[in-house]
């Protein structure tokens, strides 16, 4: 529970949602334009792809959707970083590239780590500890959320000082999130179970026999 919630938050989702107006300002959008575009576009894409995930989860399966979405998140974060790193070279195209990359990031998150985090912790625990396990998962989610949001601009500031360049500082922060997404893929291979079409009783029986998550 804590593991999937760690990766759900540490790929930077809430920094993108909370600070999207500031991120768009850094990319060259101005004032109200940045705030409106960020809020509307991010919100609409998030809602639409979260709805889509409801149809995909039982068609594609949890593990496969996790790997598809997290891979997309990783590449999107790399592209967001590149938009900032090469903003001088891209010029006006920076805005288009950044918006496209951010919306891809939101879309991939909304079909994978977003809903899967909550779904998996509701399925994998034995009945006698399900309430406790879900509570720990929820606590971990908000704890990691607070930590990531609190450190976001500190990371940017630290990288700014390291490189002496604001664009590279912002880019490096998103690349850190991309590295965490890569680690999530490795972690997911071993610890994300496939519960599609498996009853809660069979899941509990699997754990009782000492089965591994990836073998479910």
Language-model features: locations:
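Alpha-helical transmembrane bundle of multi-pass membrane proteins
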Residues: 1-216
């Amino acid at each position: 529970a804590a593991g999937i919630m760690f990766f759900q938050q540490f790929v930077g989702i809430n920094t993108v949602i909370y600070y999207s107006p500031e991120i768009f300002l850094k990319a060259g959008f101005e004032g109200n334009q940045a705030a409106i575009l960020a809020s509307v576009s991010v919100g609409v894409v998030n809602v639409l792809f979260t709805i889509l995930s409801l149809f995909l989860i039982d068609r594609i399966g949890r593990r496969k959707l996790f790997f598809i979405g997290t891979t997309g998140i990783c590449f999107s974060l790399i592209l967001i970083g590149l938009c900032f790193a090469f903003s001088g070279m891209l010029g006006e195209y920076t805005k288009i590239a950044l918006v496209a990359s951010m919306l891809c990031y939101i879309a991939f998150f909304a079909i994978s780590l977003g809903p899967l985090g909550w779904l998996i912790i509701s399925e994998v625990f034995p009945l006698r500890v399900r309430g406790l396990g879900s509570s720990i998962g929820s606590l971990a989610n908000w704890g990691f959320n607070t930590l990531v949001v609190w450190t976001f601009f500190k990371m940017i500031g630290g990288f700014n000082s390291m490189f002496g360049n604001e664009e590279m500082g912002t880019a490096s922060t998103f690349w850190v999130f991309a590295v965490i997404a890569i680690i999530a893929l490795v972690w997911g291979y071993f610890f994300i179970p496939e519960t599609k079409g498996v009853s809660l009783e069979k899941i509990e029986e699997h754990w009782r026999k000492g089965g591994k998550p990836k073998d479910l």
